[in-house]
C-alpha cells in the first residue's frame, strides 16, 4: 500500500512501519510465539491506518476473488499475489521499493541501483512467504478454467482503481 495512487507521507509512514514490524514478526507468529503474535497485531493496525487513508490496489482485488472462489484466507492470497504485482507495478513506484527493501531488512540497499533494490524488495517478500509456507504461485490453488472469472472479478473489484499502474 506504500505505492498506491493515493499514497502520501502519512500513509507511507504507517505502511512502511507496518512492513518493518510484519517482516520481523510473521515467522514467530506462525510458530505461535507471543512476541510474534503481538507484532502482527501491531503490524495489522499500522497498515490499516495506512490503507484506510490511501486505498488498496490490484493485489487485494485479486485476493478477493481467490477468497470467494477457493476460500483462500485473505492474507495467504495477498502473499501469493504480491511479488508478481510488485514486479508489474515497479515502473510506477519511483524510489518506494528502496524504502520497502529497507523495511524488509535487506542489507546494503543504500548502495543498490534502482533495479537492484526493486528486485531485493520483491525477493525479500518471496523469502518471507516461503519461510512461513505460503505457496510460491497461483498454480498451487487456481484451476485454469477459473482464470476468466478471477480476472473479471479483479477488474470489477473496488480496490482495482487504486493500483498505481493501469491494469
Q: What are the roles of these predicted feature ranges?
A:
Residues 1-54:
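Carboxylate- and glycine-rich phosphate/diphosphate-binding segment that chelates Mg2+/Mn2+
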Residues 1-10, 95-103, 130-133:
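A glycine/threonine-rich phosphate-anchoring loop and its flanking beta-alpha core
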Residues 9-20, 56, 76, 91-94, ...:
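Alpha-helix N-cap/helix-start motif at coil-to-helix transitions, marked by capping-box chemistry
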Residues 27-39, 98-105, 109-116:
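C-terminal helix-coil-helix/basic helical segment that borders enzyme active sites and/or dimer interfaces
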Residues 45-78, 157-161:
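Glycine-rich phosphate/pyrophosphate-binding beta-alpha loops
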Residues 65-104:
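Catalytic phosphate/nucleotide-handling subdomain of diverse soluble enzymes
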Residues 97, 107-167:
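C-terminal charged capping/lid subdomain of soluble metabolic enzymes
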Amino acid at each position: 500500500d506504500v505505492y498506491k495512487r493515493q499514497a502520501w507521507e502519512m500513509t507511507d509512514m504507517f505502511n512502511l512501519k507496518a512492513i518493518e514490524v510484519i517482516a520481523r514478526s510473521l515467522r514467530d507468529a506462525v510458530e505461535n510465539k507471543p512476541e510474534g503474535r503481538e507484532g502482527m497485531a501491531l503490524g495489522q493496525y499500522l497498515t490499516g491506518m495506512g490503507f484506510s487513508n490511501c486505498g488498496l490496489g490490484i493485489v487485494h482485488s485479486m485476493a478477493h476473488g481467490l477468497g470467494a472462489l477457493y476460500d483462500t484466507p485473505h492474507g495467504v492470497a495477498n502473499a501469493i499475489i504480491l511479488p508478481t504485482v510488485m514486479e508489474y507495478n515497479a515502473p510506477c513506484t519511483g524510489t518506494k521499493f528502496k524504502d520497502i527493501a529497507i523495511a524488509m531488512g535487506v542489507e546494503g540497499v543504500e548502495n543498490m541501483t534502482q533495479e537492484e533494490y526493486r528486485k531485493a524488495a520483491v525477493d525479500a517478500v518471496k523469502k518471507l512467504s516461503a519461510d512461513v509456507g505460503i505457496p510460491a504461485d497461483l498454480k498451487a490453488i487456481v484451476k485454469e478454467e477459473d482464470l476468466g472469472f478471477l480476472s473479471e472479478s479483479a477488474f470489477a473489484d473496488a480496490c482495482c482503481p487504486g493500483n498505481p499502474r493501469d491494469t
